[in-house]
């Protein structure tokens, strides 16, 4: 017989060995022998079980298609379905909000509420659409995190096997507020085109009834965009506090004022919190390597005397704040007949090792005269 679609329910229970099909004598004998038994929910036939889902509207289940769920296992332990209902009732849960894969179980849960006489205090149900894979085909899973190199959990998924360890959004440098904002817009959209919300704005605007029924594609680039925006909007003192643990993990000794300056210079250029110390490492330690493509295009041996003169000139500057220093150096470059584009590009490479990053003279002012001169001198020596 084909048992692939077998349902232990109203249509089959009398052909099974249970308390309804056996005689009282047979039941007594089984009990006397200590035969293990489960407790099932008896689903009555011919019922239309209606659920008013806050997202999907009215959903109807036919009881003839439902199985008699096991509520208590043979070892006396309750199953999820029983424990879930009792727990929610005792905790006075008002709303059950969960993924759509649980929708099929809701009919059984409604029957349990009715059976216990708790229908008047039954919570409202809302079944969220699935979060789909980045390519939009199928539900996002832990395996997709490993496949695409993206987080799929809020926090790290621990494992005794290092190969199975999965860092979460927190470990990847996401701000909680950014993640909440991103997730809120998966399947829901406000009445206007606003994307960035404070928590209070989200509370006021969000509505379960306006969530789409269809699944939403997981767009990791969009998640990163939200994180960038939240970092950019955060005040610098708060950012400095977030940067500190990353700086300390790399044994960088930094004052609060210094970390605030790091936040000011880098917040428009980073995606994740750890980028302040990884991408912007050159604000904490000497440059590790120079962008050789730029050096090859811009550096010429005859520039060495010009840079030596520039080093002497910079050393003579008493006002080492950004704007005056920039004006003085650019005037010096112009008066000595040097090519500003080449000199400034090479100065940037000397200071940061890359053409990307904060303004040259902002970095110089932050790092101070001594460190600035050491970096330029080291760079020039490396080209000899």
Which stretches of residues belong to each language-model region?
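Generic recognition of well-ordered alpha-helical segments
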Residues: 108, 112, 181-185, 346
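Conserved S/T- and glycine-rich ATP-binding loop of Class I adenylate-forming
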Residues: 41, 223, 347
């Amino acid at each position: 017989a084909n048992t692939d679609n077998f349902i232990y329910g109203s249509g089959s229970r009398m052909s099974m060995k249970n308390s309804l099909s056996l005689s009282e004598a047979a039941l007594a004998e089984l009990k006397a022998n200590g035969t293990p038994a489960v407790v099932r929910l008896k689903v009555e036939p011919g019922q239309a079980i209606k659920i008013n889902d806050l997202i999907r509207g009215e959903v109807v289940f036919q009881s003839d298609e439902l199985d008699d769920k096991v509520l208590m296992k043979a070892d006396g332990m309750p199953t999820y379905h029983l424990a879930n209902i009792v727990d929610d009732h005792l905790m006075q849960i008002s709303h059950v909000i969960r993924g759509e894969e649980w929708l099929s179980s809701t009919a059984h849960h409604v029957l349990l509420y009715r059976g216990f006489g708790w229908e008047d205090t039954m919570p409202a149900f809302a079944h969220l659409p699935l979060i789909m894979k980045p390519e939009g085909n199928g539900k996002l899973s832990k395996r997709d995190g490993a496949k695409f190199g993206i987080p799929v959990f809020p926090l790290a998924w621990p494992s005794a096997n290092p190969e199975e360890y999965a860092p979460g959004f927190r470990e990847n440098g996401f701000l909680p507020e950014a993640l909440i904002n991103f997730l809120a817009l998966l399947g829901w959209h406000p009445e206007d085109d606003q994307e960035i919300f404070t928590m209070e704005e989200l509370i006021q605007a969000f509505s379960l009834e306006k969530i789409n029924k269809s699944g939403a594609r997981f767009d990791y680039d969009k998640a990163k965009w939200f994180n960038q925006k939240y970092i950019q909007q955060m005040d610098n003192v708060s950012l400095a506090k977030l940067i500190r643990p990353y700086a300390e993990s790399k044994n960088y000794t930094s004052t609060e004022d210094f970390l605030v300056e790091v936040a000011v210079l880098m917040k428009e250029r980073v995606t994740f919190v750890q980028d302040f110390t990884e991408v912007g490492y050159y604000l904490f330690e000497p440059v590790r390597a120079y962008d050789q493509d730029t050096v090859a295009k811009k550096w010429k041996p005859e520039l060495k005397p010009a840079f030596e003169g520039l080093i002497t000139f910079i050393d003579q500057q008493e006002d080492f704040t950004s704007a005056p220093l920039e004006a003085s150096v650019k005037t010096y470059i112009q008066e000595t007949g040097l090519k500003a584009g080449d000199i400034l590009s090479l100065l940037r490479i000397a200071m940061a090792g890359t053409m990307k990053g904060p303004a040259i003279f902002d970095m110089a002012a932050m790092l101070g005269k001594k460190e600035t001169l050491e970096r330029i001198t080291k760079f020039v020596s490396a080209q000899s």
